[in-house]
């Protein structure tokens, strides 16, 4: 529950940071 959320966060925060 929350796999897509975790993936989206990493993709959005990954390149951002």
Swiss-Prot record:
Tissue specificity statement from the Swiss-Prot or TrEMBL entry: Expressed in abdominal perisympathetic organs and abdominal ganglia.
GO biological process per UniProt: neuropeptide signaling pathway
UniProt key word Secreted: yes
Keyword vocabulary terms for this entry: Amidation, Neuropeptide, Secreted
Gene Ontology terms: cellular component: extracellular region
Major location (coarse): secreted
One Gene Ontology term of the molecular function aspect: neuropeptide hormone activity
Transferase is among the record's keywords: no
Localization in the cell: Secreted
Leucine amide sites (modified residues): 17
Function: Myoactive.
Homology family: Belongs to the pyrokinin family.
Descriptive protein name: Pyrokinin-5
Taxonomic source organism: Aptera fusca
């Amino acid at each position: 529950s929350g796999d897509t959320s975790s993936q989206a966060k990493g993709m959005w925060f990954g390149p951002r940071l």
